């Protein structure tokens, strides 16, 4: 949630080469108009980028499913990750540094560090089973 009226949903795509990735957004299978930022080259010569979709908080909190779809022709990679508002939030994230898209509903990602407006505590379960706990206040989270 970016502010009291707008939510920003994020999709971080990293570890792809060459620099050519397609990202699309859907709300309950209907195309949405998201933004894909310019890719940055990483130290290992692969690339990463961020795509985001802004939606009214009223729509985000109704429980509709939003999906970030990613395809990379160079590696034949195709994947999607769906997100839905979760009050009080326990969420699942890929392991940081992995090659899969990273999202963290109901928040935005900046290096997979959740930044929230309303929640005060957040439990994160990584795909490898690891657990992280965050204490969130004033739109920022710190690991407990």
Curated annotation (Swiss-Prot):
Pfam families in alphabetical order: C1-set
Cellular component aspect of the GO annotation: extracellular region; immunoglobulin complex
InterPro entries: Ig-like_dom, Ig-like_dom_sf, Ig-like_fold, Ig/MHC_CS, Ig_C1-set, Immune_Resp_Modulators
Highest taxon in the source lineage: Eukaryota
Glycosylation sites noted in the Swiss-Prot or TrEMBL record: 3, 43, 123
GO terms of biological process kind: adaptive immune response
Region of interest (Secretory tail), ranges: 87-144
Protein name: IgW chain C region, secreted form 1/3
């Amino acid at each position: 949630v970016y502010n009291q009226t707008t939510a920003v949903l994020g999709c971080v795509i990293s570890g792809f080469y060459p620099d050519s990735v397609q990202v699309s957004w859907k709300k309950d299978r209907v195309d949405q108009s998201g933004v894909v930022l310019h890719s940055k080259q990483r130290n290992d010569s692969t690339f990463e980028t961020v795509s985001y979709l802004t939606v009214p908080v009223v729509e985000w909190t109704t429980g509709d499913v939003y999906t970030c779809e990613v395809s990379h022709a160079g590696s034949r990679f195709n994947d999607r990750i769906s997100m839905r508002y979760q009050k009080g939030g326990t969420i699942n994230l890929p392991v940081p540094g992995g090659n899969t898209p990273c999202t963290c509903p109901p928040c935005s990602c900046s290096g997979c560090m959740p930044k929230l407006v309303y929640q005060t505590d957040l439990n994160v379960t990584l795909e490898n089973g690891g657990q992280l706990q965050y204490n969130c206040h004033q739109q920022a989270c710190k690991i407990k």
